[in-house]
Amino acid sequence: MPTLYVILSLLLGLIGGVLVQRAIGSRQQAVTDDRLQREAQAEAQQIRAEAQRHARELHEAAEQDRQDAISKTQDAARRVQDAAERDTLAAAHEARLDEQREQVRALRAQLEAEREQAKADAAQQREALSTDRQETRREREDLGREIERLGRRTEQLDARSDKLDALEERLEGGWREVQRQEQEVAERLRQADLKLYEVAGLTPEVAREQILGRLNAELEEEKAIRVKAMTEKAGAEARRSARSIIAQAIQRSASETSAQLSVSVVPIPSDAMKGRLIGREGRNIRAFESLTGVDLIIDDTPEAVILSSFNPLRREVARHVLDALVADGRIHPTRIEEMVHKAQDDMKTFIHQQGEEAAIEAGVVGLKPGLVQLLGRMYFRTSYSQNVLKHSVQVAHLTGIMADELGLDAALARRAGLMHDVGKSIDREIEGTHVEIGINLARRFGEPAEVIDAIAHHHDPENGETLYSVLVAAADAISAARPGARREALESYVRRLEQLEQIAVAFPGVQQAYAIQAGREVRVIVQPEKVTDAQATLLARDIAGRVEQDMEYPGQVQVTVVRESRAVGVAR
């Protein structure tokens, strides 16, 4: 804008100069050229000065207008900036207010949730307190019953003590009677000596030997009769007490008699699935069998396939894999391998759960995790079709009951009963008998000496160092001998009976042998003219030893030798 004013001023000055020149030319005739020229120059300078002044004024005015415009623009920009800053501050303040409002709402919701949680916790605590009160009440009732039982037990012990005192008094009386009889015999011997010296004319040494020989024979017979009577009486009382304890233990214990087979039948949605399980050129079934170690039998059975394996653990893993493959629908070697690894991991968790449940059911606490895992493995182990883990739990119950009746540590007895067959959990993976493996495992996990002794001698309790091995052996026999607890194939059962009879008949002097009571007893008839009563006892022990050495059988086999003498007389 100021530049435009300058240009206009210059144009006006030029126009004025041109006009002046023209005026000067028209007036040349009236004045001289010099004067006119000077006047024209003076006037031109005046006009130029006026134009320059006017231009300067216009420039100054334009500059002032520019400065005013810049100032107004800056003021407007400042006002706009201030307004924008105020809007920004207001927006930030509003955002902070919104954020604070959200925080307040969140805090209020959190407080409400905490209040609800506190109410729920209070209700749970009240319920837990009520449960604890009920548990305490039941414990008090159990304690009362236990006190009553202990009172009855104390009364029984007192009665037994009285009987023992009476028996001791009778024994003392019998001993005094024996001493009196010995004195009488001594007196009779002295009198007999005198008579023998007088009548027979024997020397004192010879007479003394004859009398002592006769007297020793009489005393030996009398002592044998008394010892036999006392032994029979003590044995009868011991058998009666043992029967009572075992009967109580059996009455208070009950368990399932189910058994596992060596095959599992897995249902499938349709027979078309069988072809997918086999796969192209049999690659799926080969991958399945190689990864699981289980035979997959696909036959004409409608909507079902069969898994066959002697190892129940592998068979269970294979069943889980097959169920997952059928449900998923994607069946190929890679997917089969993934499912096998997943099923094996799941099976480890399942095994640990089974071990924990067995320990809880048996009332045994404080087992180390590795030992619990080994217990869980026995869930998939069978002995004569009897589940070893269920058998161990039942042995633990029976051992605890009998130990309680005998005044022993019931908790320690249950622990020994539960652990007695722990070696069977890995006896197919490690060399050695399940007894040897169980002893090593118990020592490795720091089990008490009583538990180790029970594991070592639950098949030969007569060599055990503690009573717990005897109780575990008895409970083991009770659990195995229950009807339906164990079973075997008919062919092997008949073969075992025949082998029992053949072993017994092979001994000299045996006339006949019969396997009775489902093979748990062999009755041997001997020839009385070839086998004496003393030899019959030795023969029974020898036959039992040969059976233990040559045969495998569940439980125990009793050998009974029968010797019968017949005397026939004919009256004519």
Swiss-Prot record:
GO terms for molecular function: RNA binding; RNA endonuclease activity. One of its GO terms (biological process) is mRNA catabolic process. Its main location: membrane. One of its GO terms (cellular component) is plasma membrane. Coiled coil: none annotated. Residues 59-85, 110-142 are annotated as: Disordered. Residues 388-481 form the HD domain. Residues 110-119, 129-142 have a biased composition (Basic and acidic residues). HAMAP family: RNase_Y (MF_00335). This is Ribonuclease Y. It comes from Deinococcus radiodurans (strain ATCC 13939 / DSM 20539 / JCM 16871 / CCUG 27074 / LMG 4051 / NBRC 15346 / NCIMB 9279 / VKM B-1422 / R1).
